[in-house]
Amino acid sequence: MARVLKAAAANAVGLFSRLQAPIPTVRASSTSQPLDQVTGSVWNLGRLNHVAIAVPDLEKAAAFYKNILGAQVSEAVPLPEHGVSVVFVNLGNTKMELLHPLGRDSPIAGFLQKNKAGGMHHICIEVDNINAAVMDLKKKKIRSLSEEVKIGAHGKPVIFLHPKDCGGVLVELEQA
């Protein structure tokens, strides 16, 4: 019995030392440039501006972020030119937009018909030169949902990129 225990202990030590062996360093493919700067680029990505969430009940959603999570939450702001009412949720390093449809023609109404509980609608990323970004992305065969840049909910130029060209995510680019 002692011999069996000794052998088991030796095997365990051997297994443990194999588990402790240094893991080989794997270097991810990268360039020496930061992700937001590409050599020769005439535009650069900035920070994540916001994540927009379509909600079936704007008051309930706003109360959750304010009363349960303790976030700073704005009053509801109707934006008829965009077909939504929006509540802005300040998260410190970024924002969330809670979107609720204004009328049946709202793009958010269609989203909520397909997603009854609501959900993430889009992300917004700032760019330093939206016109250059649009021209460059067109050359790269990335489609947008409109032909031209429009003024967004924050009063800045924006354009939405087609989700089929962006890994299934609706991406809004906003002039920083």
Swiss-Prot record:
Gene Ontology annotations for the cellular component aspect, listed alphabetically: mitochondrial matrix; mitochondrion
Biological-process GO terms, alphabetical: L-methylmalonyl-CoA metabolic process; short-chain fatty acid catabolic process
Protein name: Methylmalonyl-CoA epimerase, mitochondrial
InterPro entries in alphabetical order: Glyas_Bleomycin-R_OHBP_Dase, MeMalonyl-CoA_epimerase, MMCE/EMCE_epimerase, VOC
PTM sites of type N6-succinyllysine: 114, 150
Organism: Homo sapiens
Keywords attached to this entry: Acetylation, Cobalt, Isomerase, Metal-binding, Mitochondrion, Transit peptide
Function: Methylmalonyl-CoA epimerase involved in propionyl-CoA metabolism.
Residue span, VOC domain: 47-176
Residues found modified as N6-acetyllysine: 150
UniProt KW Flavoprotein keyword: no
Subcellular location, record wording: Mitochondrion
GO terms assigned for molecular function: metal ion binding; methylmalonyl-CoA epimerase activity
Top enzyme class: isomerase
Lineage: Eukaryota, Metazoa, Chordata, Craniata, Vertebrata
